[in-house]
């Protein structure tokens, strides 16, 4: 009797790092409310890694991101704070054989909105899945030359509680 063990290709880290960004944006007719203008002050911090997986050694992306957005009504200076922690992870990467990759992504993590007193007024602790299409630049295993082509859509809607953001925020800042 001969026992044959086929080895699996091991994962290799292609790239990893951390990121930080801060910016502000002015949003008119916020939440489709005519005349409601808010300033959104955004802080983003996170880390990411790209690893190869499977027999084809295709790249899989994973990130952990914290986002803090303060929405301030420019007329009244009333504000709310949205705090989100997201883990995004490629669940499946498919080489379509035509120079493109289809990627199924899982996004999960809590998002909460707090009023000025610190009370939570809206939450979304769920997860959802979506697919994207990338041009692989002729090199399926090298993500450095990939280009985003298209958002293919939500595959699985958000699970769990999903409070209406605008229904909670507009009264709090008006």
Predicted regions: what is each one?
Residues 1-11:
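Secretory targeting and sorting signals
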Residues 11-174:
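Beta-strand-enriched cores of mature, soluble protein domains
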